[in-house]
């Protein structure tokens, strides 16, 4: 997770996974919005296990993507998780899906299948969602229309 909305939406999922002894849940933060993220993780009692620290001043989207790829891939190589879970439409979602695909690690996507019908709007979020979808293993679509969008794209 990297943003405040991601943390808010994943907080109950993290809490449920950590309550269940069958799961060893590790929370990784990209450091996109450190202070806002920390407010949410503190409020929900979420311990962040790893910070990737990818943000730089005046960083371009391409620069962020490159830093995310290196940081996420390095972390996946060290941690070797059984599965990864991402949420939303950020560049982190796209890059994590690609890094997991390269390492043959299954990945789940919370809020999968949401579509605006215009790949350029919102930018880059709509493209992130569409590009990640074919690489994702488990799609957690929040609505029937999101599910239908995935099925319409040949993603199942």
Identify what each model region corresponds to.
Residues 105-156:
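Active-site-proximal region of nucleotide-activated glycan assembly enzymes
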Residues 85-103:
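An aromatic- and histidine-rich active-site surface loop
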Residues 69-80:
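Short, well-structured alpha-helical segments in soluble
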Residues 1-31:
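N-terminal subdomain of nucleotide-sugar transferases
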Residues 3, 89, 143-145:
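Helix N-cap/beta->alpha junction signal
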Residues 21-67, 71:
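Conserved nucleotide-sugar phosphate-binding/catalytic loop shared by glycosyltransferases and other
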Residues 21, 79, 103-105:
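Helix C-cap/helix->beta junction micro-motif
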